[in-house]
């Protein structure tokens, strides 16, 4: 016969002590912590969540149960594995309860992947996700510089890796190396490597610290767990975002990490990375010397070919001196004709100036005529004023006879005043008119002087006359032994012609017209 405990009558007056909810929760907490203490739990991570405070909350589950877990901020920063959804891990920590929600939970202190298979599965899933974002795309790869001036190396400062890289660079082509020391395994290694890559990219060109032209991220061989920092997402993203070309040299040739897919070039070993970074200096020198010899041979052959071609063309050309002789003769002929033309033009213009000087009046004559005209104009003006005064006086007298004496007298007095003022004004106007006429006469005299032959003589020319005083204007009008007179600006001297132009014949001589007395004769 079965029974239900609910069918039993309630116990009253029991000896069980009465407990509050808090007391019971604290008792359960002590019981659980005392009974289990540290435990090691294997399970699959579910719903991992990193709080803004830095703490990580997650669940560990298997086919039958779920266990709440928490990883405090200080421990989460030191974990060798970043918690991800679906990752199978083994966690070590303390089992405790959380009275606020009446649940028990695991306080994680260490976390590791549950076997290499689970680790590889996680890496493959991460690789697919990052590849889907395009971080491994071939078009993102940057070419390596042929000969970098500065090489940045991200590795441990105490390992054999940095010594191998420096030794190999010294053997091939010594370069300036900047070492950014980092931890290459263990807690915090991934963050240090990512910060080192970003730090090299943050160096400004031209600053006190030279900016690398190439970055090498290197580490020696190790187990899969040892190489895990180079599989971390932060390192992969830093390598993909690097503006400086990057070579990954992590592990041995058989080791592959996710940074190898994001880097611009993968080297199987750190030594191979140094070989990729720089060429062999001796090989370059040999190649340069060989190229120099080949270039010299090429230039020599080209020069010989061009020389032969030019010599062949030269043989087909005539003598350049023969080409120039005709040009020289034509040039001499043109020069002789130009000289003759200039001389003839100068003589023609000289004769024209002399004729103009003969036809011009003397300035004193022009000034006298202008003064006479001015005097006549003044006399006519005075006579006109006198006539006008007489006419007005007559009009005044006639009007005076018709008007009363007093107004007429006033008008007469005013008219007399105006009439008295007219002679001074007339004299002033006459004087101004004479001054203006005198100024014009002076200007005309200066103009006449500029056209006179005397001005020509003062500029250094000479007037030639024969014994009878007639001007000699052509060389053909002279004969050897003929006496001539040479008139300068300050006087006249005698001279005798010592020769005549070849082939010149005396031309018909014309008697110059008699110059006016006021202008003065040339002789």
Swiss-Prot record:
Protein name: Exodeoxyribonuclease 7 large subunit
Compartments (UniProt record): Cytoplasm
Role summary: Bidirectionally degrades single-stranded DNA into large acid-insoluble oligonucleotides, which are then degraded further into small acid-soluble oligonucleotides.
Stretch list, region Disordered: 502-523
One of the GO BP terms on file: DNA catabolic process
UniProt keywords, alphabetically: Cytoplasm, Exonuclease, Hydrolase, Nuclease
E.C. number: 3.1.11.6
One GO molecular-function entry: nucleic acid binding
Annotated family: Belongs to the XseA family.
UniProt-listed Pfam families: Exonuc_VII_L (PF02601), tRNA_anti_2 (PF13742)
Reactions mediated catalytically: Exonucleolytic cleavage in either 5'- to 3'- or 3'- to 5'-direction to yield nucleoside 5'-phosphates
Assembly information from the UniProt record: Heterooligomer composed of large and small subunits.
Residues forming coiled coils: none
Any one GO CC term of the record: cytoplasm
Domain of life according to the entry: Bacteria
EC class of the enzyme, as a word: hydrolase
